[in-house]
C-alpha cells in the first residue's frame, strides 16, 4: 500500500507543477497581447500626430506656400503682408494662372523684407473659403495685418506685384468705403440732389445683407468711376426706423432706386457686375426720342411688340416730364418713345400732349381700334398713365412666347392656340389664317386673354396637356386663375370648335388636365404621398389639417429634410385630424395657385375649413422643433395640448 500511496502522491505533485507552469505561461501571453495593443495605439497616435504635423507644416511648391484650414492662422499671425490665391484644382483659369503666380512669388521673395505668396485649395479649405467669401476661382486677396484686401485688377505679374508693394508700405491704409452712409440727418439732401442713386436698407445681423455687402461696395467703386458717377448708399434700417417706415421696408436687404427723391423698386441682380449693368441701364432715359416718320413706319411694319409714343411740345413741357416719370415705373417691361415732331403727330392723328398706344401691323385686326389715345398733362398721375398702358398693351390675339410670357401673359383665364407660328415672309399667310379664326372668337370674350403660341416653343406644355400626340395641326387649351389647365379635345380646328370649347369652360363643364404620377397602391406610411390626381382629395380635404411638402427628387435640401420629416410624421401619427404629406412637384401639377412652389423644398400648412389660405413655412430651421411649433401654431384639429405633445 505504501508504494501505491507514494505513486499517487508523486502524480499529484506532477499535476500541480504542470498547472503552475500553464498558469505562468497564460499571463505572459496576455501581457504580450496588451503590450502589442499598446504599441499599435501608440503607432496610430504617432500617425495621427504625423498627419496633424503634415497639416500644420507649411509646404512650398515652386516658391508658392501651401496653406490650409489647419496652418493658416499660425502662419499669418506675425506677417505684415501676405498675397493669397484661392483656387480649385479643376479650374482652368487657375491652371493658366499658376506659372504667372509662381513668378510673382519669386519676385516678392526677393523683396526686403520678403513678402510671402501663398495658395489655398478652396475646395478642401472650406472654412477659409467661407471666411473670405470666396465664390469664384481664382480669387486673389492681399492680407494686411490680418485684414483681407480684395484684389480687383488684372491677373498679370506687373499689376499684382505693384498692388502688393503698395499695400505692404508701412503707412498704407485701406481706402474709405465708396458706399455712402445715409441717416435721417442727410438722407433727403443726398437723395433729392441725385439724378439717380441706389439705396440699400439693411440690418447688421442679416445674413443676406452680409453676403451682399462686398458685392455692393465693389459695384459702388465701379459706378463711381463713370462720368457722371452713379452713387450707391446704405441705410441701417434697424437704427433709422423712421426712414425704414417711410419707405415701407419690411425685409432685408431692401433696395430702392431714387431719382431726384422719387423712389422706384430695384428689381436687378445682387452681385457686382449685375448691379453695375442694371444701374447703367437705369441711368439712361426711360423713353427714346423718335426723330423721323420713317422710324414710326418701321415700328408698324416690322415691330413685334406694343408701340408706345408720347407726343409733346418740348422737353420743358410739364406733360413730358410726367410721361418720363411714368415710363420709369414700367421701363423694365415696355419700351417707351416720345417725339416733338408735328409731322409724326399728324401721321399718328394725335395732338401734342397725348399718348398713343398701338400694335404693329401684324397684330392689328378689324375687331379692335388701330390705336388708343390718352391726354397727358403735368397734373396727370403716374398710376393713370401706367393703367392706360397696361390696359391696351396686348392685342386682341397676341403672340405668346417664352421671352414675353412672364411680362405679357400672366392674366388668366388665358386661351392659347398652339400651332406652327411663323411670321416670316413665306409663312406669314398661314400663321395669320389660323390667327384670324381665333380672332373671331376672342372678340366675343373680352374678359379672357387670347394668344397664339408656337407648338415647338411650348412642347413641354403641349405634352403636359396630353396634346403632343393629338394628330392635329392646331390645338387649344385654357389656363385658369387657380393654375388648372383645360385641353380642347383634338378635332379639326375652326372658329366654331374653339367657341364651343371656351363656352364650355365658361359654364364650368370642362374637367382639368392634371399631370400626375400613378396613385400609390399602398399609402399607409406616416407620410402620405400626394400626386396630382389626389391633391384635392388629400390636401384640400376640408375636414383635416394638412402639412404638405413640395419637393424635387434631385434636391439636396429635400434629401436632408427627409429623415426629419419622417420623424415629424411619426410624432403626430396618432392625430386623426392631421395629415403629414409630400408631393414630387417635378412630376405632378399643383392644381391650385394658392400653393405656389418657387423653390425646393416648399412647405405649406393647409388648415381645415380654410384651404384657400394656406400658411407657408418661412424663416425657421427645418428641424423637428421648428416644424412641430409651426404645426401647433396653425393646427385646428390637434386632440392633445402642446404640453402633452
UniProtKB/Swiss-Prot annotation:
It is found in: Endoplasmic reticulum lumen; Melanosome. SUPFAM superfamilies: Thioredoxin-like. Pfam families: Thioredoxin, Thioredoxin_6. Disulfide bonds join 91-94, 206-209, 555-558. One of its GO terms (biological process) is protein folding. The keyword Repeat applies. It catalyses: Catalyzes the rearrangement of -S-S- bonds in proteins. Residues 21-169, 158-301, 505-636 form the Thioredoxin domain. A motif (CXXC) lies at residues 91-94, 555-558. Its EC number is 5.3.4.1. This is Protein disulfide-isomerase A4. Residues 24-58 are annotated as: Disordered. It comes from Homo sapiens (Human). The gene is PDIA4.
Amino acid at each position: 500500500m505504501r508504494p501505491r500511496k507514494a505513486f499517487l502522491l508523486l502524480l499529484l505533485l506532477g499535476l500541480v507543477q504542470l498547472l503552475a507552469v500553464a498558469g505562468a505561461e497564460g499571463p505572459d501571453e496576455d501581457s504580450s497581447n496588451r503590450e502589442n495593443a499598446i504599441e499599435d495605439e501608440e503607432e496610430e497616435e504617432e500617425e495621427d500626430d504625423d498627419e496633424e504635423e503634415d497639416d500644420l507644416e507649411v509646404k512650398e511648391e515652386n516658391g508658392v506656400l501651401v496653406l490650409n484650414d489647419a496652418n493658416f492662422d499660425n502662419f499669418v499671425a506675425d506677417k505684415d503682408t501676405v498675397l493669397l490665391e484661392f483656387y480649385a484644382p479643376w479650374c482652368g483659369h487657375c491652371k493658366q494662372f499658376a506659372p504667372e503666380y509662381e513668378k510673382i512669388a519669386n519676385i516678392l521673395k526677393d523683396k526686403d523684407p520678403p513678402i510671402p505668396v501663398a495658395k489655398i485649395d478652396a475646395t478642401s479649405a472650406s472654412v477659409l473659403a467661407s471666411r473670405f467669401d470666396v465664390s469664384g476661382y481664382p480669387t486673389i486677396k492681399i492680407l494686411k495685418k490680418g485684414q483681407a484686401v480684395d484684389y480687383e485688377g488684372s491677373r498679370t505679374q506687373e499689376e499684382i506685384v505693384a498692388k502688393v508693394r503698395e499695400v505692404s508700405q508701412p503707412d498704407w491704409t485701406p481706402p474709405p468705403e465708396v458706399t455712402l452712409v445715409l441717416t435721417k440727418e442727410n438722407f433727403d439732401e443726398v437723395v433729392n440732389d441725385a439724378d439717380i442713386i441706389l439705396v440699400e436698407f439693411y440690418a447688421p445681423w442679416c445674413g443676406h445683407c452680409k453676403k451682399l455687402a462686398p458685392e455692393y461696395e465693389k459695384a459702388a467703386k465701379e459706378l463711381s468711376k463713370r462720368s457722371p458717377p452713379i452713387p450707391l448708399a446704405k441705410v441701417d434700417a434697424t437704427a433709422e426706423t423712421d426712414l425704414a417706415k417711410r419707405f415701407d421696408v419690411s425685409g432685408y436687404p431692401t433696395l430702392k432706386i431714387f431719382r431726384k427723391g422719387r423712389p422706384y423698386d430695384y428689381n436687378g441682380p445682387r452681385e457686382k457686375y449685375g448691379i453695375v449693368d442694371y444701374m447703367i441701364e437705369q441711368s439712361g432715359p426711360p423713353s427714346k426720342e423718335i426723330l423721323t416718320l420713317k422710324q414710326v413706319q418701321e415700328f408698324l411694319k416690322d415691330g413685334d411688340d406694343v408701340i408706345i409714343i408720347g407726343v409733346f411740345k418740348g422737353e420743358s413741357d410739364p406733360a413730358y416730364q410726367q410721361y418720363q416719370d411714368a415710363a420709369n415705373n414700367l421701363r423694365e417691361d415696355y419700351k417707351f418713345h416720345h417725339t416733338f415732331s408735328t409731322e409724326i403727330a399728324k401721321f399718328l392723328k394725335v395732338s401734342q400732349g397725348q399718348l398713343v398706344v398701338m400694335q404693329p401691323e401684324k397684330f392689328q385686326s378689324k375687331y379692335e381700334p388701330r390705336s388708343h389715345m390718352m391726354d397727358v398733362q403735368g397734373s396727370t398721375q403716374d398710376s393713370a398713365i401706367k393703367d392706360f398702358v397696361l390696359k391696351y398693351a396686348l392685342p386682341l390675339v397676341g403672340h405668346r412666347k417664352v421671352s414675353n410670357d412672364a411680362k405679357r401673359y400672366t392674366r388668366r383665364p388665358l386661351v392659347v392656340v398652339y400651332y406652327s407660328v411663323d411670321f416670316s415672309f413665306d409663312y406669314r399667310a398661314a400663321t395669320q389664317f389660323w390667327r384670324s379664326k381665333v380672332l373671331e372668337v376672342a372678340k366675343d370674350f373680352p374678359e379672357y386673354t387670347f394668344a397664339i403660341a408656337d407648338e415647338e416653343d411650348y412642347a413641354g406644355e403641349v405634352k403636359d396637356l396630353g396634346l403632343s400626340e393629338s394628330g392635329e395641326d392646331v390645338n387649344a387649351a385654357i389656363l385658369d386663375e387657380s393654375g388648372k389647365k383645360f385641353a380642347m379635345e383634338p378635332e379639326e380646328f375652326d372658329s366654331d370648335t374653339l367657341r364651343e370649347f371656351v363656352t364650355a369652360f365658361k359654364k364650368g363643364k370642362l374637367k382639368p388636365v392634371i399631370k400626375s404620377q400613378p396613385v400609390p397602391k399602398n399609402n399607409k406610411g406616416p407620410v402620405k404621398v400626394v400626386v396630382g390626381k389626389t391633391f384635392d382629395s388629400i390636401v384640400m380635404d376640408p375636414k383635416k389639417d394638412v402639412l404638405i411638402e413640395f419637393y424635387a427628387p434631385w434636391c439636396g435640401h429635400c434629401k436632408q429634410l427627409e429623415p426629419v420629416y419622417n420623424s415629424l410624421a411619426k410624432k403626430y401619427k396618432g392625430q386623426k385630424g392631421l395629415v403629414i404629406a409630400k408631393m414630387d412637384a417635378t412630376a405632378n401639377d399643383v392644381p391650385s395657385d394658392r400653393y405656389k412652389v418657387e423653390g425646393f423644398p416648399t412647405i405649406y400648412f393647409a388648415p381645415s375649413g380654410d384651404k384657400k389660405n394656406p400658411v407657408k413655412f418661412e424663416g425657421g430651421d427645418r428641424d423637428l422643433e421648428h416644424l412641430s411649433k409651426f404645426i401647433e401654431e396653425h393646427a385646428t384639429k390637434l386632440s392633445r395640448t402642446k404640453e402633452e405633445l
